[in-house]
From Swiss-Prot:
Organism: Yarrowia lipolytica (strain CLIB 122 / E 150) (Yeast)
Reaction(s) this enzyme catalyzes, per UniProt: ATP + H2O = ADP + phosphate + H(+)
Alphabetized PANTHER family for the sequence: ATP-DEPENDENT RNA HELICASE RHLE (PTHR47959:SF13), ATP-DEPENDENT RNA HELICASE RHLE-RELATED (PTHR47959)
Gene from which this protein is expressed: MRH4
Upper classification of the organism: Eukaryota, Fungi, Dikarya, Ascomycota, Saccharomycotina
Biological processes, Gene Ontology terms: maturation of LSU-rRNA from tricistronic rRNA transcript (SSU-rRNA, 5.8S rRNA, LSU-rRNA)
Name by which UniProt lists this protein: ATP-dependent RNA helicase MRH4, mitochondrial
EC number: 3.6.4.13
Length: 514
């Protein structure tokens, strides 16, 4: 079977010669990477066009290391701490937030009596971000007995939260955020503030698809915690948005562009900010709208910038606004997890003879006969570099009997929303009749590679070699999420640059800096 030949080079099958397929072993990376030279990278951040407003809390740039791993000794201690955490009960969470977790993290039936173990990035985020919320005491004389009141220290904390795709980063930033919002409700001032028409915290994301996904997670906390949330979504009317801002909002999830278009917003009271997929929201297409929105939050106490890929240029850019940002990075950042089986298929060699379509049919045939996920329709995400190439491949697959969905930027919002809902929900049960293929293909571009949690997705095909290491990591990261097994096939031919392909594979093994 083709799938077996992908797993081990030494096992030929279906007439596929060993030289056509390379299985890439994910070699373990050393636990600690020693910090690079202090003093920042070469050159200065590229100047932007036009006027850009610096966010509140932004300071004059200071020399700072751009190495994402920071101090080696501190990283080692943090990793050991996270590895020793066996339950959320050991972390400093608000009791009400902790009580909701069993309903949010749905365990299989045979594990429901066990404690829920946080991922490494969740343990690190809660430990470091919650310890950084500092308060001071103020003695008040009321009547005969003096009282001691806790008030928050007026100082902004800024973090970068970096971990592999599928490692639970959404909960890693939501748990400290929600715990701190609940802690604020203990202060006497809350009795007045709870009636204000204001937004207490903002989560910025690059797409409405991701906004809906984060909003669905937040909805599970809403009633138990007594909080009010709102997430921007497809097809919302202006009246719906205006109604949401007409009351107190504890958590707002939206895109920078959507927020700029909303006239009723009141961000002046927001104390917490999360920028999810921050490397995207700080690139040239988004940075002006992102920084404009952040500048409207003068009372920020805590800001977290979350990403699966943290390049030196991104970190340098972020430190131009926040020189003392604290980096919270999980081990093996930028490396493909060991539970993902990664294989390279050289389509120049027999039996494909430079025909990627034949290689794709062979891969889909093997997947349809796999013993993995045999109780469900097996969903396969096939990535292409350009949306213009999707219609032709869709027609070819449909002519060969495969049901195909597409997701790309040229589709209208309603069509995109239908596809997103289909793949972020559980797959359909398998057709048990003989010769049923039980495979469904999603043809897409990078629009589906960022943040989307596709339920029970095991198989990914990189039909085109990604343009760069960042795209590569995000595409591969659609499978193998939350420790589940995944399989990735990357097709290469003579048109692909050997140096670029080898560089991607080197990154996948070692988790090198971008």
């Amino acid at each position: 079977m083709f799938a077996n030949s992908l797993r081990r080079i030494t096992k030929p099958c279906l007439g596929v010669p060993d030289m056509a397929v390379r299985h890439i072993a994910m070699r373990p990376k050393p636990k600690v990477k020693v910090n690079s030279r202090e003093g920042g990278g070469k050159g200065k951040p590229r100047p932007s066009t036009g006027v850009r407003r610096k966010p509140p809390g932004a300071q004059k740039q200071q020399p700072a290391s751009i190495a994402i791993n920071g101090d080696a000794a501190r990283r080692l201690l943090e990793s050991k701490f996270a590895a020793n955490i066996s339950s959320f009960n050991e972390l400093k969470l608000h009791p009400d937030v902790r009580a909701v977790l069993p309903d949010v993290i749905q365990l299989p039936e045979h594990k429901q009596d066990q404690d829920i173990k946080p991922s490494i990035i969740q343990s690190l985020a809660v430990k470091i971000m919650r310890q950084s919320y500092t308060y001071k005491q103020r003695v008040k004389n009321e009547g005969e007995e003096p009282t001691v009141e806790k008030i928050p220290v007026d100082r902004q904390k800024t973090f970068v939260l970096a971990a592999q795709t599928g490692s639970g980063k959404t909960l890693a930033y939501l748990l400290p955020l929600l715990s701190d919002l609940k802690d604020q409700e203990k202060f006497p001032s809350w009795q007045l503030e709870k009636h204000y028409k204001t937004v207490r915290s903002v989560i910025l994301v690059p797409t409405l698809e991701l906004s809906q996904q984060v909003g669905q997670v937040l909805k599970q906390f809403e009633e138990p915690l007594g909080i009010k949330t709102f997430a921007s979504a497809f097809g919302q009317s202006h009246q719906e948005i205006a109604k949401a801002f007409n009351n107190r909002l504890d958590v707002l999830v939206t895109t920078p562009q959507k927020l700029q278009q909303t006239r009723e917003k009141n961000l002046g009271g927001a104390t917490h900010l999360v920028v999810d997929e921050a490397d995207t929201l700080f690139d040239t297409n988004f940075i002006d709208s992102t920084t404009d929105v952040i500048s409207q939050m003068p009372k920020l106490k805590c800001a977290a910038f979350v990403a699966a890929t943290v390049s030196k240029s991104f970190l340098r850019k972020l430190r131009s606004f926040y020189p003392h940002v604290v980096v919270i990075a999980a081990p093996r950042l930028h490396a493909i997890p060991d539970h993902i089986r990664f294989s390279v298929v050289d389509v120049n060699k027999a039996p494909y003879y430079n025909n990627k379509k034949v290689a794709l049919l062979q891969a889909l045939y093997a997947i349809s006969h796999s013993q993995k996920q045999k109780n469900y329709v097996r969903r396969v995400v096939v990535f292409r570099n350009r949306k213009e190439h999707i219609p032709e491949l869709k027609k070819f697959l449909e002519e060969n009997g495969y049901p195909v969905d597409t997701l790309h930027g040229k589709q209208d919002l309603h069509e995109r929303n239908e596809v997103v809902e289909k793949y972020t929900n559980m797959p359909d049960a398998a057709d048990q009749t003989e010769n049923a293929r039980n495979v469904r293909v999603l043809l897409t571009t990078d629009i589906a590679s960022r943040g989307m949690d596709m339920k029970n997705l095991r198989f990914v095909v990189l039909y085109d070699v990604p343009f760069d290491k960042t795209d590569f990591i995000h595409r591969v990261g659609r499978t193998g999420r939350f420790g589940r097994e995944g399989e990735v096939y990357m097709f290469t031919d003579n048109q692909d640059k050997k140096a670029q392909t080898n560089q991607l594979l080197h990154t996948s093994r070692n988790g090198l800096s971008l």
